[in-house]
Every structure is written in structure tokens, then in C-alpha cells.
């Protein structure tokens, strides 16, 4: 007996990240190889023809799990009964644009999308914001959807998490899949703090394997933080395939579970680790039965506190920068 199809809404459907994302969702990488999906694709009116072209390609893959596709420029159509919403589309920063202008341009998009989710999405909708500034965009959407549980709104730090994993694997020679208990704290921006104090690889302490505090502070943390900029510099385009892969990882783990393994998600704070409530902040979590749970009680040393407070300061500044645009 086939499962009933799940509805997956994707915004920015004509964009580069979506182009790497949609085929994998239709292939079952997001929700499982036995779960049919209906894709509900949102983009601007001027991008509708491009979305139609992507849909033609999706059709030409003849994916057994793709049960239907909706193309629209109306958030209320895109988010209707959505089980998962991947908010990929955002206003990119153009040359000479101040950060506050970027924040207000995105606040406009995410208040509308949050309100539409509030009105028409499934009450259990799992929302992942990929479009930058992701944490604050997720905060805006959450605040614009008062009837949905706050825990439904998350921001993507999985790309930072995966970048940190690959740097640690390269440094230690350990297989990337063997590394456990890595955390990435804070904002999805160069201020985030990748933290391997608790990490292990094949049962060995990552701190002992690396044994190089200067590398941690001067190479590892900046490399992970500035990796996106390094890719733009090398390729002339932003990281789209790796971002799409991280989005798949984030939602798949949220839905299907992590078997006790730590992953990083940007989630609304409950006040723990000294982070004010509701701020969407990257923390280590485990997932089971479709729910995430923050890893509690980790010791925060002085260096970590400084890094965690630094990324928090940026998030508070962003929050205050959009406060006047939010109703509640």
C-alpha cells in the first residue's frame, strides 16, 4: 500500500539552489525512498517561465515518487497544506547595499510568507529557511505565524556543520562519517562558532587528534566561517549544490531521525546556553520521531562563551533591525 503523498513547498524555485534541490527531493532523498511527494513551487511572476522549464526536466526524469507539481507566484497556493516548506528564495545583497536595507527587503518577503504559512500550511509543517540572512529570516517568518508552534521554524546551519566536518576529516585523516558530536553555534554567517571540544572520531577525542589550538583559532574557525566567500571567489557563483545538500540533510534528519547522532540546526532558543528566548540560534540537536531536541548541559569554556556571545550580538542587532517591521 503506497503512502499518501507529502506536500513539499519550495520557494525561489527558479534559482540555483532549487535546481540542485528539486531533483533530489523528487528522487526520495528528503523524506525517504517510499514516500511520494507533491512539489509546490513558488517564485516571482517574472520567473514563472523558468520554473516551467525546471518542471519539464522533472517530468523528463520520470521519478516514481513525484506525485504532482504545482507552479505558482502566490504563497497561499504554494504553502497550502504543506508538510515541509523550504524557504530558499531571498533577496540577495546587491552591490552597495547596506545590511539594514537587505534586512528590510527580506523582512518584507518573510512576513508575507510567514503569514501565508500561518493561514494555509499543515499545523505540523516543518519550515527550513535557507535564504540569507537565514536565522533572522526564520525569526521573521516565525513571528509572522502566531498560530503555528515556534518549534516548526528552523534555519540552516547544516552547511556550516558539513563544512566543519570536512575540514576536521582533512586535518586528522579520519573518515568524515566517523566524526560525531560536532557542534556549530550561532548565526549562519562568518561569526558562527564551529566547536569540536566534544567531538570524537572512531572513539578518539577530536581535541587530542587535532592537538593544535592555533590551528583551531587561526585556520579552522575562519575557514569554515568564510568558506562561502572562498567558493564565490573561486567559482564566480555562490555555493548552490552544497547548500541544497545541506538542506536535504537538515530536513531528512528532522523527519527520519539521527539515531542519537548530533547535528546542528538553527532553532528558537528556550533560554538555555545564555541565548535569549526566540532568537533562532544554531545549536547541537538530536532528532527522533519527527522532533528535534537540543543537546543540554554542555560545558561552555571562556573562549566558547566569547565566540557564542559574538555571534549572538550579531543576531540581536539583526533582530533589533527588523523589530519595527514586525507586528508582534
UniProtKB/Swiss-Prot annotation:
Reaction equations catalysed: (S)-malate + NAD(+) = oxaloacetate + NADH + H(+)
GO biological process entries: malate metabolic process; tricarboxylic acid cycle
Keyword set, alphabetical order: NAD, Oxidoreductase, Tricarboxylic acid cycle
Amino acids binding substrate: 93, 99, 132, 163
Residues annotated as catalytic: 188
Family label: Belongs to the LDH/MDH superfamily. MDH type 2 family.
A Pfam family recorded for this sequence: Ldh_1_C
Disulfide bonds: none
Gene Ontology MF terms: L-malate dehydrogenase (NAD+) activity
Protein name as it appears in the record: Malate dehydrogenase 2
Amino acid at each position: 500500500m503506497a503512502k499518501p503523498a507529502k506536500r513539499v513547498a519550495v520557494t525561489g524555485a527558479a534559482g540555483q539552489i532549487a535546481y540542485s534541490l528539486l531533483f533530489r527531493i523528487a528522487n526520495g532523498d528528503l523524506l525517504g525512498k517510499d514516500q511520494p511527494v507533491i512539489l509546490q513551487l513558488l517564485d516571482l511572476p517574472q520567473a514563472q517561465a523558468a520554473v516551467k522549464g525546471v518542471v519539464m526536466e522533472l517530468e523528463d526524469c520520470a521519478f516514481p515518487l513525484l506525485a504532482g507539481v504545482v507552479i505558482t507566484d502566490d504563497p497561499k497556493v504554494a504553502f497550502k497544506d504543506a508538510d515541509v516548506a523550504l524557504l530558499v528564495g531571498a533577496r540577495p545583497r546587491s552591490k552597495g547595499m547596506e545590511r539594514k536595507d537587505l534586512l528590510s527587503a527580506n523582512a518584507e518577503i518573510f512576513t508575507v510568507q510567514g503569514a501565508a504559512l500561518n493561514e494555509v500550511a499543515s499545523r505540523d509543517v516543518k519550515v527550513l529557511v535557507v535564504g540569507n540572512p537565514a536565522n533572522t529570516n526564520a525569526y521573521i517568518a516565525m513571528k509572522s505565524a502566531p498560530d503555528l508552534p515556534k518549534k516548526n521554524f528552523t534555519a540552516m546551519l547544516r552547511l556550516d556543520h558539513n563544512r566543519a566536518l570536512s575540514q576536521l576529516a582533512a586535518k586528522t585523516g579520519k573518515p568524515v562519517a566517523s566524526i560525531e558530536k560536532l557542534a556549530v553555534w550561532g548565526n549562519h554567517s562568518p561569526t558562527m562558532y564551529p566547536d569540536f571540544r566534544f567531538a570524537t572520531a572512531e572513539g578518539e577525542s577530536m581535541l587530542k587528534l587535532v592537538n593544535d589550538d592555533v590551528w583551531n583559532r587561526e585556520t579552522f574557525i575562519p575557514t569554515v566561517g568564510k568558506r562561502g566567500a572562498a567558493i564565490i571567489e573561486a567559482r564566480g557563483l555562490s555555493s548552490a549544490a552544497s547548500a541544497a545538500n545541506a538542506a536535504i540533510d537538515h530536513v531528512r534528519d528532522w523527519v527520519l531521525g539521527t539515531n542519537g547522532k548530533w547535528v546542528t540546526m538553527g532553532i528558537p532558543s528556550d533560554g538555555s546556553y545564555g541565548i535569549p528566548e526566540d532568537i533562532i540560534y544554531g545549536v547541537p540537536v538530536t532528532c527522533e520521531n519527527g522532533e528535534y531536541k537540543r543537546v543540554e548541559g554542555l560545558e561552555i569554556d571562556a573562549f566558547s562563551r566569547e565566540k557564542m556571545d559574538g555571534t549572538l550580538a550579531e543576531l540581536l542587532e539583526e533582530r533589533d533591525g527588523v523589530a519595527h517591521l514586525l507586528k508582534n
